[in-house]
């Protein structure tokens, strides 16, 4: 049986303790993009949302609360995978820097979703049930179980990398889309603005997974990757079209199903494989957040939440500009 070559990204190295010299400029640039997009939950104004909440239909409220319940739990699952496995496995300092910052951002997402639920739900029993949705809600539990099985499983790093790209790229897609639909209708400004920031972050995290995958020497077979992606698509479709139908917020389930397939095709393309569904984007207004890689959505700097000084420090090769104190003023 031929030996499988060791992956440079995973090969133990004392260099992992020092940030410089940068080994992978493209990873360093991703890290800097993540830094430039830092935001906090305190920067999201929820003052108008309570008034809007009272005008929503019971179906709309049900949809929003259960989407938020899934989001609140899923960020914790992503965190557990990053801290428990990926951070220990990846040995490249700049990749570990990205994961370290992603952990901080996922904590902010988790705080944001929890704040939204706190703000909207006044009944303490219902609030408790939603915060424990992984145990109390079958449709949330199914998605969570699929993600959790990859944390403790014996699958290769490549398989788990693809699976968590699906968690962040596909499992959030239908819900992100539905919340953007609310924005299109002029509803819930705090929720929809936080959704813009979070969907941008998750798009970058998904891009990072695709970048790391491209740097692996041993790739998965097309059949294996498409199997993982198709699994995720079916679970997301069931979640947002059946168990928690997007019709509750006035969206067409068939179009939503097509949108999920479209997002999955984009992910497959980013991973270097052929499309599975050949689906078109049925929601032209979602072009900006189709999680397509280095998106124009990211470059638009949603709400100007990109720290210009961080990005200007990059000069194309991962190095930083020289800082001088002897300039003439």
Swiss-Prot record:
Keywords: Cytoplasm, Deoxyribonucleotide synthesis, Iron, Metal-binding, Oxidoreductase. InterPro entries: Ferritin-like_SF (IPR009078), RNR-like (IPR012348), RNR_small (IPR033909), RNR_small_AS (IPR030475), RNR_small_fam (IPR000358). Induction: Maximum level of expression in mid-S phase. It is found in: Cytoplasm. One of its GO terms (molecular function) is ribonucleoside-diphosphate reductase activity, thioredoxin disulfide as acceptor. One of its GO terms (cellular component) is cytoplasm. Its EC number is 1.17.4.1. The active site is at residue 113. It comes from the Eukaryota. Fe cation 2 binds at residues 106, 168, 202, 205. Fe cation 1 binds at residues 75, 106, 109. It catalyses: a 2'-deoxyribonucleoside 5'-diphosphate + [thioredoxin]-disulfide + H2O = a ribonucleoside 5'-diphosphate + [thioredoxin]-dithiol. It holds the Pfam family Ribonuc_red_sm. Provides the precursors necessary for DNA synthesis. Catalyzes the biosynthesis of deoxyribonucleotides from the corresponding ribonucleotides. Heterodimer of a large and a small chain. Belongs to the ribonucleoside diphosphate reductase small chain family. This is Ribonucleoside-diphosphate reductase small chain. It comes from Nicotiana tabacum (Common tobacco). The lineage of its organism: Eukaryota, Viridiplantae, Streptophyta, Embryophyta, Tracheophyta.
């Amino acid at each position: 049986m031929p030996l499988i070559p060791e992956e440079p990204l995973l090969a133990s190295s004392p260099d992992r303790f020092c940030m410089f010299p940068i080994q992978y400029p493209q990873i360093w640039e991703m890290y800097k993009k993540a830094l430039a997009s830092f935001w906090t939950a305190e920067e999201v104004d929820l003052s108008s949302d309570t008034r809007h909440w009272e005008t929503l239909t019971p179906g709309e409220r049900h949809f929003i609360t259960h989407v938020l319940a899934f989001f609140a739990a899923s960020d914790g699952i992503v965190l557990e995978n990053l801290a428990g496995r990926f951070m220990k496995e990846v040995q490249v300092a700049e990749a570990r820097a990205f994961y370290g910052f992603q952990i901080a951002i996922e904590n902010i997402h988790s705080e944001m979703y929890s704040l939204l639920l706190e703000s909207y739900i006044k009944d303490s029993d219902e609030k408790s049930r939603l915060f424990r949705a992984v145990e109390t809600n079958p449709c949330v539990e199914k998605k969570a179980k699929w993600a959790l099985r990859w944390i403790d499983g014996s699958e290769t790093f490549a398989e788990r990398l693809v699976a968590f790209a699906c968690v962040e790229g596909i499992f959030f897609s239908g819900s992100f889309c539905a919340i953007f639909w609310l924005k299109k209708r002029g509803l819930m400004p705090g929720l929809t603005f936080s959704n813009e920031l979070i969907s941008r972050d998750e798009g970058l995290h998904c891009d990072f997974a695709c970048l790391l995958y491209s740097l692996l020497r041993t790739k998965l077979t097309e059949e294996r990757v498409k199997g993982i992606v198709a699994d995720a698509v079916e679970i997301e479709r069931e979640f947002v079209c059946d168990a928690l139908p997007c019709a509750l917020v006035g969206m067409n389930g068939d179009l939503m199903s097509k949108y999920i397939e479209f997002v999955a095709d984009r992910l497959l393309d980013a991973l270097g494989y052929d499309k599975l569904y050949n689906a078109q984007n049925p929601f032209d207004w979602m072009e900006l957040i189709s999680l397509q890689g280095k998106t124009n959505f990211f470059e638009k700097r949603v709400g100007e939440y990109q720290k210009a000084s961080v990005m200007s420090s990059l000069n194309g090769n991962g190095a930083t500009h020289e800082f001088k104190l002897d300039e003439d003023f």
